[in-house]
């Protein structure tokens, strides 16, 4: 729910993408982008169902936007690329901390199932670290008043 406080028992923060930003003007727009891949170690016999998760965009540990993700198990070591945007408007002037976090919602009951975000799953060989890395972009628009 928008406005909820970051609860690290429910959300996994991606530390490498945490950034401090400075807002100078009361009128502003913030565009957040995160992209990368995630991969499960499902086997060929588990090609039904998938994993439902969400990406949360947090400013000062308050949820400002959330977007769903779904990884469909269509083949062994299923993976999916994603590019997701979040927005915020009119943050107060000052320094703010932006965090991106992942929350797993549901997954099939498969013994030993693991999901890796931003890297290849250690049980799979179909992705490289380079192609599965996560990155983020933070764009701040602060129009001048003349």
Which stretches of residues belong to each language-model region?
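Extracellular jelly-roll beta-sandwich "head" domains, especially the C-terminal globular C1q domain
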Residues: 1-146
């Amino acid at each position: 729910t928008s406005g909820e406080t970051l609860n690290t028992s429910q959300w996994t923060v991606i530390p490498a993408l945490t950034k401090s930003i400075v807002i100078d003007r009361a009128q502003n727009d913030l565009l957040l982008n995160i992209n990368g891949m995630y991969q499960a170690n499902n086997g060929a016999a588990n090609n039904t169902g998938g994993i439902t998760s969400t990406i949360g965009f947090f400013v000062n540990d308050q949820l400002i936007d959330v977007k769903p993700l779904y990884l469909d198990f269509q083949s062994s070591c299923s993976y999916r690329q994603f590019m997701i945007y979040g927005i915020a408007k009119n943050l107060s002037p000052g320094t703010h901390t932006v965090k991106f976090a992942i929350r797993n919602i549901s997954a099939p009951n498969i013994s030993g199932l693991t999901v890796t975000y931003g890297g290849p799953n250690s049980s799979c060989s179909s992705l490289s670290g380079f192609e599965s890395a996560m990155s983020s972009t933070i764009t701040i628009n602060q129009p001048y008043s003349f």
